Each structure stands twice: as structure tokens, then as C-alpha cells.
């Protein structure tokens, strides 16, 4: 079975790699080449610089993020190295796509539903279209028959499955070592996020802790390699995720919890989202709404005894393992794929 997917989020795409290639034995492909953009089939936005970053072979990003198209061509396929997840992606040009038979096309943003349906109508009449929903998009009125959602469940009339995006639990796991006095953020472009003031205020009133801000355009730069990201999480006392807008899925929160580390989080943004199932105030997380008095958060952290903190870490891990079962979800996904319309 061959599946073609768009590519806009590295963590999401790697989760599709783990699902379709590693678990199901399918072949997963993504686009490469600016023809996708020029002919209207890549519609993340209308900026050519962004399109070049995602589609142009050998492109070097202008920010400090890692290149997305570093690889080589073999026959009609480009083999792209995923430096962060240490895997390889198969990418094809639009011309190769037209001459290859696919069973499924997967769109992961609403802007791609219409162009992907056009691709099916013109070149892949045998293929089925899946909409993979990783954020809380408004999909009212969109022509979606098959929904694969890594969000909190909601009402949908059609073929559907709700699941968690997979990541490597052999890497994101407890280290067995006590953490350092570190509080770490993995919020991209933190200085333009609503939680920025909370972060810098907490850092200012807690000089006994080291604060790190990782991600695109962040003070401490991007972290390359999931093993390095996991090590930083394992070494951190808390994750900082006071983020405006929240996340549909919430990779960072799930990663921290899998490592057995509690997070400082704006609970109101997440309580009704998928990651919210992991969050129990004062058990797996410390609540800090955007604009809150951060001195209260600092006091709560400082008042924890070693046993209380160790209990929070164990609760975080236990809650993750209670909510996330990739093997069980695989069975539901197989049924969903067998019922594609």
C-alpha cells in the first residue's frame, strides 16, 4: 500500500512514518520540488520563501532550524534525512506523483483538502482521501469523509478514529537519575508568545534555577536529535509550557510526561484538549495561566519536599501510560483504514 502525505510539522510526519511504515508496512511519501507550490498543491501559505524551506532540495533555512530537504536522489525518489528523528523520508516531485499509483492521500491542514481532492480526481481516481487533524481546526462544511484526529474526541459523522501521534518511548522515558534545578521551555518563538512574560518573570524571581528556552528563534537555539531533547527533559525539574493558543495534540507535554517530568502549564488552554487528559493540577502539573502572579508558582515549587516532587514525577509518568497505548490504538486505526470511503 502506498500513501502520500503533505508535510508541515516534523513531529507529526515522523509519527506517520512510525505508524504507516513501521507498524503497518506501507510506503509513505511526501512532496518535494517547487512545482507543488507553483501549481497550487502546496498551500501552507502563499510565501515562496516558506515553500522553498519545505520543498526545495538542499534548501538552507534562514533561521536556525535544521534543513528539511537534506538528502539524495535515487531513481524517481528523493531520500531525505530527518536529522531530528534519525530516519529517512521518501519524497517525490509532482511529475513522479502523477505517474505513481497511490492508495491513500493524507492532508493534515484544511488548506490541502481541496487541492488533494483535485489530485485524486485528476491523477489518482482509485485513491481515498484522509484528513489528519492535529489541531482544533474548524472543519464545518468541509468535504471530509475519513477523519484521523489526534485531538480530543468530538462529534463527526463519517469514518473516524481518534488517536495519539506516536513518538519513540525508548528515547522519551525516565532516566532514573534526579533532575537538575532546571526549568525548560520548548515553545517555538517564545518571545512572540503570550507566555513570554510569565517565563521571564519566573526566571527573574527564581535565580536558584537555570532557565532554558529552546526552539525556532529562541534564546538557546534549536535542539537537534530526539535523544538530546529527551536528555534535556530528563534533566529538567519542570517543563515550562505556558503557551497561548495551546496545541491540538501537544507533543511537548506528552514528551515531558513520558520522561516522568511535570510541567508548568496554562491549564485553561489545555483542559479540553488531548494533552489535558494528562494534566492534574498539583499532581502532574503546576497551573500558571498567562498573566498570573508567578511568585505563587515559585513558592509552590520551592515548598515541594523531595518526596512530594518524586510523587509528582511518578504521577506524570503514570498518567501518560494510562492515557497512551499505541498498540491498542493501532487496532482501531487498522479498522478505520479498512473502512475508508
Model-derived regions, located:
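Acidic donor-binding loop of glycosyltransferase active sites
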Residues: 231-248, 261
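Short hydrophobic beta-strand element within catalytic cores of glycosyltransferases
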Residues: 262-272
